[in-house]
């Protein structure tokens, strides 16, 4: 097995500090991807090149340490993971997601290629997945914190979901304490700050990707949605 976690919100919603990175790795995560909060924790610049399992967005325009795509060898299988930001509604300058993906694909000989596509627009996510045809194994959407009900094997053979969802507080607004969001977003109280709950029902969102042992073609994508260790599995029908 090989486990990927998007860790860009793990440090109180803003980026990933070294302690939280170490926490994920010690608890069985093989690869940590990021997103638009990739540099919110200043220390990430200092340690991203000292660790082997942290990937920042591939297509950011600024010069930044680290890599946006890496290959991991697991039991003789080469698995590439790429982290790409969408361009629709982006508040930070990004290079063209499609062209940057192609620049990796053109020189890629890995057995499996999984893209964490961190974007706002579900339309952009799906169009991006279709545009790559069968040149990648999976396009997994992240960023909105809400798991979508569209996990599928595209007719191109790509495993896809618009958004895998989040892990965090269940009785919340996208993982943030409810009243603090109401004050800031609904009542426009600029003095209010987002708060996070340490003691609440816990939501675990994920997907399981299944590949053929011989051809490495994607066969199935199974979403998981679990609250306090109780939940359900959405199987494709």
What are these regions (language model features)?
Residues 1-237:
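Acidic, metal/ion-coordinating pockets
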